[in-house]
């Protein structure tokens, strides 16, 4: 009996220790909770939305007219014009990527107030929260704009339709059945995002030397270093107020264009003039325009801007650009 008892105890010890062996160990896989501990992971949601911007790569949508000519026999527009354009081949499909980016922006907006962006400085932490919130609204509005440009149109009911409006992160499959809003409702949604973004963003990024140089909306800041850390030179090329205003102007022009302004509503043209006029005033009016801006691609113009000199100058004609390349593929394909 004693042997049976000892055997039973040893067997029990083995069984219970084996249970521990079957328990999954920490395999270093990240969970969503990591965003609350490491702000760089939280910002990754926003950066992901940035990566889906159609302008991250060279596109020629704005110059693809009926008489466009190219030397590239595999050019997307040529393939579309010669019969390949279909549901299976659609180079103008922004539906998947832009909607995906909108959901990333929505998810980020849902957590941005819960993240500690700067543990050692509450004032700087609040400035980061402010800037990143503005960026998220701006990026969401930009993706809505591109969706409208490429996918809005007349529905089967004869109504001018826009896009499904997603202003929150979708938790389940049923939420994806949201119907398209009208074109007018969709445009209003874009403007709402841009207007909200402008509450948080300065017109331009860049270091300041004195509190007297603080832009409107930031006059409560008491330390120049705090402002420069968040809105200074290191933030250049991220979405700022000037870029938002430019997209508001583009949205207004799109809404006024014959493609979507089916009744030629003159008020829409006036609105487009107003939005773009404000941007020109911010640039200094006519004198702020580059007289050679239409030749921005020529070597003399690029050299004059000294883009690689580190002085933060740029071509006046260009508001927001991607990195500079030295290849000549564009010239080979189109000249």
Predicted regions: what is each one?
Residues 54-62, 142-157:
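Conserved alpha-helical segments that form or flank metal/cofactor-binding pockets of metalloenzymes
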Residues 1-30:
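Bacterial Sec-dependent N-terminal signal peptides
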Residues 44, 75-153, 171-188, 192-206:
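Conserved, well-structured interaction surfaces
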Residues 148-149, 155, 205, 254-263:
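Short coil/turn linking the two alpha-helices of tandem helical-hairpin repeats
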Residues 184, 246, 255-274:
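Acidic, serine/threonine/proline-rich low-complexity intrinsically disordered regions
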Residues 206-232:
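Charged, glycine/proline-rich intrinsically disordered loops and linkers
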Residues 37-41, 46, 50, 74, ...:
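Elongated scaffold/linker segments in the mid-to-C-terminal portions of large proteins
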Residues 19-65, 69, 269, 292-300:
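Membrane-proximal, proline-rich intrinsically disordered regions
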């Amino acid at each position: 009996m004693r042997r049976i008892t000892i055997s039973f105890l040893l067997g029990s010890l083995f069984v219970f220790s084996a249970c521990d062996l079957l328990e999954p160990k920490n395999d270093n896989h990240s969970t969503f909770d990591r965003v609350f501990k490491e702000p760089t992971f939280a910002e990754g949601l926003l950066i992901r939305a940035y990566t889906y911007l159609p302008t991250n790569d060279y596109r020629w949508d704005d110059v693809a007219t009926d008489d466009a000519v190219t030397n590239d026999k595999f050019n997307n527009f040529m393939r579309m014009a010669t019969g390949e354009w279909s549901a299976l081949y659609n180079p103008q499909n922004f539906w998947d990527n832009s909607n995906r980016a909108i959901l990333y922006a929505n998810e980020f907006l849902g957590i941005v107030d819960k993240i500690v962006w700067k543990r050692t400085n509450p004032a700087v932490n609040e400035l980061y929260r402010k800037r990143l919130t503005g960026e998220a609204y701006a990026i969401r509005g930009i993706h809505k704009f591109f969706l409208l440009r490429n996918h809005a149109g007349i529905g089967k009911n004869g109504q001018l339709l826009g896009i499904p409006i997603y202003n929150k992160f979708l938790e389940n499959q049923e939420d994806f059945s949201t119907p398209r809003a009208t074109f007018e409702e969709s445009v209003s949604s874009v403007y709402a995002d841009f207007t909200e973004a402008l509450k948080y963003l300065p017109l331009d990024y860049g270091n300041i030397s004195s509190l007297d140089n603080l832009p409107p909306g930031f006059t409560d800041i008491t330390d120049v270093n705090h402002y420069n850390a968040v809105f200074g030179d290191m933030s250049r090329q991220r979405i700022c107020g000037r870029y938002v205003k430019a997209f508001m102007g583009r949205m207004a022009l799109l809404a006024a264009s014959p493609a979507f302004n089916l009744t030629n509503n003159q008020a829409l043209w006036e609105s487009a003039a107003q939005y773009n006029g404000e941007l020109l005033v911010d640039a200094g009016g006519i004198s702020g325009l580059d007289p050679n801006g239409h030749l921005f691609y020529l070597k003399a113009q690029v050299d004059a801007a000294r883009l690689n000199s580190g002085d933060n100058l740029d071509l006046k004609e260009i508001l927001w650009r991607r990195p500079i390349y030295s290849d000549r593929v564009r010239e080979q394909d189109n000249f």
